[in-house]
């Protein structure tokens, strides 16, 4: 294999640039050329491709976002669109791909493998941490720390005004961010999609906190934990609260910013491992880190098997929220 492509797709995640850097430099060490594909699958269809050398990826390890940009592509969802993308890859002389992204990215990559025989190795880049086959995904640690900093600041104003704050974090289908941020931030309640949320039970927890002398509380809500997110949950229990309550949606701030050391190291390790796997003949797999070791998981398994939250941590958070 003499020439490979690398692209980012779906939602951006801090550390993607560190992964791109690792792909390019590991490939260079193996004598393999790298072509950067801009704007994900949309750019692949349009042939938006640029050569990437070792100097092209200098000074990006600390940058958030992705220098290759990312986009969603409706056209790639069709067989005709994927055929166009494959034709562009062939025309560019690309013999294999490193796909950096989440489950949507990997589902698209699987189509290229199954329909056109294009070798693809995936690198897990998503703040949601919801991919099976890796303990952590690139961007998760940064998102947690970004959200935690915001919650620490909100707790200050919550205490000053003796209010309850319902804070919404990202996670439509997975509660990894909410759980880690909630536990680290000392939240009184953590609402995640993996567990049914009973508004009455939430109100009872907050009322019990008030009886114990608490004048302010934090409720961390994953966006998919309850219909309408944090605002929907507050609306369902507002009449039961004896204190003022506010909603804060952290939103896309969780995706941005300079990646943490942990994310930079993970991205560097997995980006390099993806190149080694691809050049070594692997395809249709995702590189991940499991118990400190690099592991390969079939892409199909990575997106279809459910990765569960640590329910022991959820129970611990309930014990500690006194």
Swiss-Prot record:
Keywords for the protein's UniProt record, in alphabetical order: Allosteric enzyme, ATP-binding, Cytoplasm, Glycolysis, Kinase, Magnesium, Metal-binding, Nucleotide-binding, Transferase
One GO cellular component term noted in the UniProt record for this chain: 6-phosphofructokinase complex
Signal peptide as annotated in the record: none
Subcellular location field: Cytoplasm
Cofactor: Mg(2+)
EC number(s) recorded for this UniProt protein: 2.7.1.11
Pathway: Carbohydrate degradation; glycolysis; D-glyceraldehyde 3-phosphate and glycerone phosphate from D-glucose: step 3/4
Field pH dependence: Optimum pH is 8.4.
Temperature-related properties: Optimum temperature is 85 degrees Celsius.
GO molecular function: 6-phosphofructokinase activity; AMP binding; ATP binding; fructose-6-phosphate binding; identical protein binding; metal ion binding; monosaccharide binding
Keyword ATP-binding: yes
Biological process, per Gene Ontology: canonical glycolysis; fructose 1,6-bisphosphate metabolic process; fructose 6-phosphate metabolic process
One Pfam assignment: PFK
Catalysed reactions, semicolon-separated: beta-D-fructose 6-phosphate + ATP = beta-D-fructose 1,6-bisphosphate + ADP + H(+)
Binding site residues for ATP: 11, 72-73, 102-105
Binding site for substrate: 126-128, 163, 170-172, 223, 246, 252-255
Superkingdom of the organism of origin: Bacteria
Residue numbers binding ADP: 21-25, 155, 186-188, 212, 214-216
Active site: 128
Subunit details: Homotetramer.
Function: Catalyzes the phosphorylation of D-fructose 6-phosphate to fructose 1,6-bisphosphate by ATP, the first committing step of glycolysis.
Entry similarity comment: Belongs to the phosphofructokinase type A (PFKA) family. ATP-dependent PFK group I subfamily. Prokaryotic clade 'B1' sub-subfamily.
Name the record gives this protein: ATP-dependent 6-phosphofructokinase 1
Gene that specifies this protein: pfkA
């Amino acid at each position: 294999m003499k020439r490979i492509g690398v692209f980012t797709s779906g939602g951006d995640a801090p550390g993607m640039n560190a992964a791109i850097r690792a792909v390019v430099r590991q490939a260079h060490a193996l004598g393999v050329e790298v072509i950067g594909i801009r704007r994900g699958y949309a750019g692949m269809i349009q042939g938006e491709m640029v050569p990437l050398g070792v100097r092209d990826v200098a000074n990006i390890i600390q940058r958030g976002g992705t220098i290759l940009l990312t986009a969603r592509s409706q056209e790639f969802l069709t067989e005709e669109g994927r055929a166009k993308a494959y034709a562009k890859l062939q025309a560019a002389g690309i013999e294999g791909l490193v796909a950096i992204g989440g489950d949507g990215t990997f589902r698209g990559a699987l189509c290229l493998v199954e329909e056109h025989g294009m070798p693809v190795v995936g690198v897990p880049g998503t703040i949601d941490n919801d991919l099976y086959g890796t303990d952590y995904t690139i961007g998760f640690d940064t998102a947690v720390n970004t959200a935690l900093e915001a919650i620490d600041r909100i707790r200050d104003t919550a205490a000053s005004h003796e209010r309850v704050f319902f804070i919404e974090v990202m996670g439509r289908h997975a509660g990894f961010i909410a759980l880690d941020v909630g536990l680290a931030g000392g939240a009184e309640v953590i609402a995640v999609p993996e567990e049914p949320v009973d508004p009455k039970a939430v109100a009872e927890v907050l009322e019990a906190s008030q009886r114990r002398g608490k004048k302010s509380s934090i409720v961390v809500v994953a966006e998919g934990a309850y219909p309408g997110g944090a605002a929907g949950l507050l609306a369902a229990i507002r009449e039961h609260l004896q204190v003022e309550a506010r909603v804060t949606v952290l939103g896309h701030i969780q995706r941005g910013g300079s990646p943490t050391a942990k994310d930079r190291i993970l991205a560097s390790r997995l980006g390099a491992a993806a190149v080694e796997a691809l050049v070594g003949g692997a395809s249709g797999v995702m590189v991940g880190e499991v118990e400190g070791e690099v592991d390969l998981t079939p892409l199909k398994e990575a997106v279809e098997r459910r990765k569960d939250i640590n329910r022991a941590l959820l129970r611990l958070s309930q014990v500690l929220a006194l």
